[in-house]
Amino acid sequence: MAFLKKSLFLVLFLGLVSLSICEEEKRETEEEEHDQEEDDKSEEKRFLSMIPHIVSGVAALAKHLG
């Protein structure tokens, strides 16, 4: 009977450990996705802020050539 109790406790312990590891990996994955979204947004903002400079450069070039 004691052997069965020890085996049951071991199985429960290993199950809890694996569950904890899975939850930790899930949190890390969610954090990485969140960081990636923030990086994408900042890249988009940088690109959008460059558009007026590009347009004025093209207009100046067209004026110079035209």
Swiss-Prot record:
GO BP annotations of the record are: defense response to bacterium; defense response to fungus; innate immune response; killing of cells of another organism
One Gene Ontology CC term in the entry: membrane
Q: Which Pfam families does the entry link to?
A: FSAP_sig_propep
Q: In which tissues is it expressed?
A: Expressed by the skin glands.
Q: Which UniProt keywords apply?
A: Amidation, Amphibian defense peptide, Antibiotic, Antimicrobial, Cleavage on pair of basic residues, Cytolysis, Fungicide, Hemolysis, Immunity, Innate immunity, Membrane, Secreted, Signal, Target cell membrane, Target membrane
Record keyword Signal present: yes
Q: Could you tell me which residues belong to the region Disordered?
A: 25-44
Q: Which residues form the propeptide?
A: 23-46
Acidic residues biased stretches: 30-41
**Intracellular or extracellular location(s):** Secreted; Target cell membrane
Q: Which residues form the signal peptide?
A: 1-22
What this chain does, per the entry, is described as: Antimicrobial peptide with high activity against Gram-positive bacteria, moderate activity against Gram-negative bacteria, and moderate activity against fungi. Acts by causing bacterial membrane disruption inducing leakage of the intracellular content followed by cell death. It adopts an alpha-helical amphipathic structure in membrane environments. Also shows highly potent antiparasitic activity against Leishmania species. Shows moderate hemolytic activity on human erythrocytes (LC(50)=33 uM). Is also active on human monocytes (IC(50)=23 uM).
- Of which family is this protein a member? Belongs to the frog skin active peptide (FSAP) family. Phylloseptin subfamily.
Q: What is this protein called?
A: Phylloseptin-S4
Source organism = Phyllomedusa sauvagei (Sauvage's leaf frog)
